[in-house]
């Protein structure tokens, strides 16, 4: 029997397929351009497949996926898919752990859509589509916000008018929780400890840090939205909120237009004026491009600043600093540049270990380092599949 993991947006469905018994991933892929002309379904199985198929909505995409799974002999029939686990960005404050999918859970996700208008609606469309396409399957959800439900009031509150904050539900929610939780569980196994204290640096195009104490999130850099925190690929991270008003007045721009700039044209892309892909910016850095050097130094400093704050929060017993996600796992340059800017402890990277390709995980610090530094590959899909299995065992 199989477990299907779904991560859906408004016009796409990313998926991964796992064997239920041993949780081995056997396939992955994406259905793109749902509701748009020239739809494409890509599947990686025994080889890479690509199909040009128009899909008018998520239900048609779900049905086409199942047909193609049978066509390429990934499954014999749809009944082999016993469990489906969905990634949902926002569960508000009510959904604080992976949950079986029932009408109450769906209602909470619908209610939380106002906090994640770009993400939750697509997930809901996919949930409803697979309920119809695979009526026998048992469904569960993992929330990106859930791991951060352990953050206390001091750390999740914003110093704005209290009545307004209460009325509108304005607080830090945090994101990337599935990844932060996966890394927490993995570090426990690596260190053979029942609980761990560490700072996790999930650095991809989107990026967030998490302070983990006794294996629970006590603070995280993203906030009410994923725009908060450190500088990212295209997102600004933290800025003075009055910049909004100033730019809108000076440029005769709407709040929505400037918020879009902060989300899509800022960060590494906006500062470097080169690309949101760090590899391109690193290449220009090596060639002495002044704007690339400035962008990467600013980026590294923003990450180091948050890391230092979080090391202070989890002290005195600090088990590790962990780098994960696309940049964290693959950029030796960024890891070195960030660690060199953290001065509160003597943290030393082993140049050779930091430079080599990382497998599942790698210790990259020296024996003299006061805090061990690891690179650990994250696997959100495996976390979702594992939870789906546990919830339905």
UniProtKB/Swiss-Prot annotation:
GO terms for cellular component: cytoplasm. One of its GO terms (molecular function) is acetate kinase activity. GO terms for biological process: acetate metabolic process; acetyl-CoA biosynthetic process. It is found in: Cytoplasm. Mg(2+) binds at residues 7, 380. The keyword Transmembrane does not apply. Mg(2+). Can also accept Mn(2+). Its cofactor is Mg(2+); Mn(2+). Catalyzes the formation of acetyl phosphate from acetate and ATP. Can also catalyze the reverse reaction. Belongs to the acetokinase family. This is Acetate kinase.
